[in-house]
């Protein structure tokens, strides 16, 4: 078996030893001399060498040792030059088996003093390719490229130029491009293609195809598109499949304008866009919210006698549902059914999700029943959509029934299912059922996430269960889940409503130390708590603190404070006439009204 390791030593930069003057002149890897054939096929050294190889060669795995132990090979070795090896490859006067010549090349390459040029390796690679030893030929080119490294395409390719008209030269160009590509030297592979055009080689179809495939995985889409246009202009075969792939890549990047250019290029090059071509671009336009272009393409598709398929309708229906254009979505649904197309589960899920989002529960249930009548079975995504729709509508019994039906069908509820139920029951004021669902989650090995914890905390706060809510908050923190602003604010509000503003402020500090920046809503909750306790001085100090850190008070802030000042102006507050203040819009108005309240309070005391 051929091993690159055997030949790798031939590419070293060590100084060669002498076998003969001729071998010394051509013994370096970087030799710029051209390797020419001997003038006479009857060169006695070449004949002796051929006879020695014929008499000593044994089939693998003994091929290498057969030369090492052969006296006739050892005898002719001092007379050999690189020219003789090249002449053996080119002329083969005794018509030796190709494998014996390749085996001898490996042997002689391992001998001190023999360092072949790039051209020599290409000569042998071409010889092997002519005799259909393609794997061995490719391995020689891999050896050349691995030795020369990156940015070597120009210096390596020049060795192929004089071989342009010889048989199998096209194979060598393809193999060289493939080798550079497989080693990740993409610029070198591209340079090989451009040099092949410059020196008028045939288009390296295999090399270009391999390079294009690699670029699809690694390179920016714009670079791939430019290279594809370049090879098409050189004569690379047209393929609408490649255009479709490039369109899809541009669409995924959100670059719809370049995707349109690719689509337009299909017809410019006298190709017919396929249904995949149209669908790719329609879907791209729909994802960026350009429904007009999506429908324009559908019309163009029908005009060109390309029938829209289920995917076409699915993309457009999904876009209509996202824009809450449910009538239009159902119109397309009816159209596709009339054309004999069978809606799939994706389309039904899209419609059901659209109705769920809009709170159209009856239409959601109607679409669900249609789906079942078509023999389609819901997946976990659709079940979760139904559960969410029922929970948002407050129909918790129906939501629970959907989950029970899902379990009977052998589908296990996931985190989204349970979290949606917990949130629904907490919003509905049934925290106990939510806690039971949480236990069910634990039994099934599903951990509660931020949404689930927040729902429980908020639900408990609404019911005034502040101790349980704080316990859930601490559990949330122990699980490594950071509460959001809403959760902290709900906790503060619950404690303040219980008259415990002090704990509310502790939670504020905890919230700030966790990296949160409290909003005006959070401060309003605390201000309301202080005002209800009659701590108006502390409330005004909190207002100043808000202003100092850049939190802008809103109407609720000022009106909460005014209510507090009016209520707690003095113990005889019932005798003070509350000003008709309406909505206070700024700090100056607030201070003016507070001063008015203070004056009224003093006047009352002085009577």
UniProtKB/Swiss-Prot annotation:
Sequence ranges of the PPR repeats: 239-273, 274-308, 309-343, 344-378, 379-413, 414-448, 449-483, 484-518, 519-553
Pfam (any one): PPR
Keyword Repeat part of the UniProt annotation: yes
Gene3D superfamilies in the cross-refs: Tetratricopeptide repeat domain
Keyword field: Repeat
Superkingdom: Eukaryota
InterPro entries cross-referenced by the UniProt entry: Pentatricopeptide_rpt (IPR002885), TPR-like_helical_dom_sf (IPR011990)
Recorded GO CC terms: mitochondrion
NCBIfam families listed in its UniProt record: PPR
Family (UniProt): Belongs to the PPR family. P subfamily.
Record's protein name: Putative pentatricopeptide repeat-containing protein At1g09680
Organism: Arabidopsis thaliana (Mouse-ear cress)
Record lineage: Eukaryota, Viridiplantae, Streptophyta, Embryophyta, Tracheophyta
């Amino acid at each position: 078996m051929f091993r690159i390791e055997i030949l790798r030593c031939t590419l070293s930069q060590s100084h060669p030893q002498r076998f003969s003057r001729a071998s010394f002149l051509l013994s370096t890897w970087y030799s710029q001399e051209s390797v020419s054939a001997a003038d006479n096929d009857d060169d006695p050294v070449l004949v002796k060498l051929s006879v020695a190889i014929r008499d000593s060669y044994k089939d693998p795995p003994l091929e290498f040792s057969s030369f090492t132990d052969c006296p006739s090979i050892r005898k002719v070795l001092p007379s050999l030059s690189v020219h003789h090896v090249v002449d053996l490859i080119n002329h083969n006067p005794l018509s030796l088996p190709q494998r014996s010549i390749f085996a001898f090349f490996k042997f002689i390459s391992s001998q001190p003093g023999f360092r072949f040029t790039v051209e020599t390796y290409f000569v042998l690679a071409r010889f092997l390719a002519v005799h259909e030893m393609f794997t061995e030929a490719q391995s020689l080119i891999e050896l050349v490229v691995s030795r020369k490294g990156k940015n070597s395409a120009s210096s390596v390719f020049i060795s192929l130029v004089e071989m342009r008209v010889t048989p199998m030269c096209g194979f060598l160009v393809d193999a060289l491009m493939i080798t550079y590509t497989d080693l990740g030297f993409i610029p070198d592979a591209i340079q090989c293609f451009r040099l092949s055009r410059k020196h008028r080689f045939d288009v390296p179809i295999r090399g270009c195809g391999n390079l294009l495939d690699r670029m699809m995985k690694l390179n920016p889409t714009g670079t791939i598109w430019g290279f594809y246009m370049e090879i098409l202009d050189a004569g690379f075969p047209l393929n609408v499949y490649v255009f479709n792939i490039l369109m899809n890549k541009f669409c995924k990047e959100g670059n719809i304008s370049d995707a349109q250019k690719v689509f337009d290029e299909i017809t410019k090059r006298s190709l017919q866009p396929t249904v995949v071509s149209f669908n790719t671009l329609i879907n791209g336009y729909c994802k960026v919210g350009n429904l007009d272009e999506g429908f324009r393409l559908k019309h163009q598709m029908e005009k060109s006698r390309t029938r829209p398929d289920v995917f076409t309708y699915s993309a457009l229906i999904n876009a209509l549902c996202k824009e809450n254009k449910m009538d239009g979505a159902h119109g397309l649904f009816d159209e596709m059914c009339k054309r004999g197309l069978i809606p799939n589960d994706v389309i039904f899920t899209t419609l059901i999700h659209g109705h769920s989002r809009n709170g159209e529960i009856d239409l959601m249930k109607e679409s669900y029943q249609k789906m079942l009548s078509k023999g389609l079975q819901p997946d976990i995504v659709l079940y979760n959509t139904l559960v969410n729709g029922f929970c948002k509508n407050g129909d918790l019994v129906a939501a629970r029934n959907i989950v029970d039906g899902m379990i009977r069908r052998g589908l296990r509820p996931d985190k989204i299912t349970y979290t949606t139920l917990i949130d629904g029951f907490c919003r509905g004021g049934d925290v106990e059922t939510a806690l039971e669902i949480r236990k069910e989650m634990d039994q099934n090995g599903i951990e509660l996430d931020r949404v689930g914890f927040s729902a429980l905390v908020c639900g408990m706060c609404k019911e005034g269960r502040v101790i349980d809510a704080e316990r859930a908050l601490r559990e949330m923190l122990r699980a490594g889940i950071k509460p959001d602003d809403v959760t902290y604010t709900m906790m503060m509000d619950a404690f303040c409503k219980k008259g415990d503003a002090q704990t509310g402020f502790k939670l504020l500090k905890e919230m700030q130390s966790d990296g949160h920046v409290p909003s005006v809503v959070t401060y309003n909750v605390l201000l309301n708590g202080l005002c209800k306790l009659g701590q108006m001085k502390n409330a005004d100090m909190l207002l100043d603190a808000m202003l100092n850190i850049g939190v802008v008070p809103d109407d609720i802030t000022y009106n909460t404070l005014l209510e507090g000042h009016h209520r707690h102006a003095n113990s005889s507050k019932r005798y003070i006439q509350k000003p008709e203040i309406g909505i206070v819009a700024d700090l100056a108005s607030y201070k003016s009204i507070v001063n008015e309240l203070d004056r009224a309070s003093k006047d009352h005391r002085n009577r």
